[in-house]
Amino acid sequence: MQVVLRQAIPGLGKPGEIVNVKPGYARNYLFPRQMAVRVTPGILKEQQVRLEQEAARKLAERQQAENYKTALETIGRFVIRKKVGEHDLLFGQVTTSDIAEVVLATSGLDIDRRNILLNEEIKKTGVYPVQVKLHPEVTATLRIQVTPE
């Protein structure tokens, strides 16, 4: 018997998925607990429309991430000013929060600091490449320039 899940069920599927289950399982467990409904032609059409809308939304998100990537990479360098001691060593280090603030101030794009990936700790002045994950499939590479105050 085919049913549409209303909520996530471990080992069976996610909400909105159409799955095959045994009739007894559907009648005695899923239907009484309102975890699933029987598949009808109307529900199939509704499901198809929902899937198309979801695909369009994901495509729009990816396109927007590509636009942000292009905008960020055309800026060139993002400059961060920090206090410096001997041998161009910073007092402290450049954090992902610092990078997010500079990107917001320079480009107006608010990036979550958890999406910024540092290959190495930034403890000296210089230019460093930094990866920013804008979308699960889109990653931008920024150039961060650390200069003395």
UniProtKB/Swiss-Prot annotation:
The alphabetical list of record keywords is: Ribonucleoprotein, Ribosomal protein, RNA-binding, rRNA-binding
* SUPFAM superfamilies xref list: L9 N-domain-like (SSF55658), Ribosomal protein L9 C-domain (SSF55653)
Q: Name one GO cellular component term.
A: ribosome
What domain of life does the native source organism fall in?
Bacteria
Q: Which Pfam families match?
A: Ribosomal_L9_C, Ribosomal_L9_N
Its Gene Ontology molecular function terms?
rRNA binding; structural constituent of ribosome
Q: Which Gene3D superfamilies match?
A: Ribosomal protein L9, C-terminal domain, Ribosomal protein L9, N-terminal domain
Q: What is this protein called?
A: Large ribosomal subunit protein bL9
Species this protein is from: Synechococcus sp. (strain JA-2-3B'a(2-13))
